[in-house]
Design a protein with these regions (language model features):
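Conserved AAA+ ATPase "SRH/arginine-finger" region at the nucleotide-binding site
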Residues: 228-237
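Conserved D-loop-proximal element of ABC-family nucleotide-binding domains
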Residues: 189-190, 204, 220
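Conserved AAA+ ATPase "sensor/coupling" helix adjacent to the nucleotide-binding pocket
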Residues: 225, 241-243
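A short beta-strand-to-loop transition that corresponds to the Sensor-1 phosphate-sensing loop
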Residues: 182-183, 210-215, 235
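Clamp-loader machinery-focused feature within the broader ASCE/P-loop NTPase space
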Residues: 29-190
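Short hydrophobic alpha-helical segments enriched in small aliphatic residues
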Residues: 5-7, 14-19, 26
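Short regulatory helix/loop adjacent to the ATP-binding pocket of P-loop NTPases
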Residues: 194-199, 215-225
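Loop/turn-to-beta-strand initiation segments
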Residues: 173-178, 203-209
């Protein structure tokens, strides 16, 4: 049986509890991501051994922790003083990741379009704030934060062009550039095809972290170019142990 993290939390702490009541979530380190010990060890080992795939698909059910895991991975990848189990949490890179403001970590996510706004940039401060409070964010929570009511959240060709523009920039700190795309399955066909072209001809030292809850909605050609990172559903015992 699958359990949404928020559902189990509320069953333990009460109907009004949510992830932001646990302040340790604000710093997304591997040690703060609930459960998934074997997967964490594998991801850490891959980085330490220099096996960093240029495109990785963090796939899992809603509320299972795939976004939190991808953020912890990005932090560890960019950490300047990481050890064998986690990022240091203290270097300049980690301090920037504490606020999701690392200049080499680019964030893309679905939005609702207006006549004037069709890219993520104007929404980025709000998305950062939301994710820092709710690393187990799902699309309904994000829609509520945007107060978009019944408007459709999506990613259009303008966002794909925004991705290309960001990737054309040099690495600010001279290492990896990370492009984290949350819910790429909400890209329209034109945007997905543009993303595919970027994945086919990646810039050096660029890592794509695609965070998805519905791989069936992604282009098969995108799936074929991304290394699968399967983030399984949380068990209620894992969430209770984290309290």
């Amino acid at each position: 049986m699958r359990f949404h993290a928020h559902m189990v939390l509320r069953s333990v702490c009460g109907p009004h509890a949510h992830m932001s009541t646990w302040p340790f979530f604000a710093l997304v380190l591997f040690s703060k991501v609930i459960g998934h010990a074997a997967l964490k060890a594998k991801l850490i080992g891959n980085i330490r051994e220099g096996r960093v795939a240029h495109a990785q698909l963090f796939m899992g059910p809603r509320g299972g922790g795939n976004l939190a895991m991808a953020l912890a991975y990005a932090r560890y990848l960019l950490c300047q003083d990481r050890d064998t189990v986690d990022a240091c949490g203290k270097c300049s890179s980690c301090l920037q990741m504490n606020k999701l403001e690392h200049p080499d970590v680019h964030l893309e996510f679905p939005i609702f379009f207006t006549d004037k706004v069709k890219v993520c940039e104007p929404f980025t401060p709000q998305w950062r704030q939301t994710v820092l409070a709710e690393p187990y964010l799902d699309v309904e929570q994000w829609r509520d934060r945007l107060e978009s009511e019944n408007k459709q959240l999506r990613m259009g060709v303008d966002i794909a062009q925004e991705i290309q523009r960001k990737l054309s920039l040099r690495s600010f700190m001279g290492g990896y550039k990370v492009m984290l795309i949350w819910l790429p399955e909400l890209m329209d066909a034109a945007a997905a095809n543009k993303l595919l072209k970027v994945l086919e001809e990646p810039e050096p030292n660029t890592v794509f972290l695609l965070v998805s809850t519905d791989a069936e909605q992604l282009l098969a050609t995108i799936l074929s170019r991304a290394q699968l990172v399967k983030v399984s559903a949380l068990r209620p015992t894992e969430l209770v142990e984290a309290l």
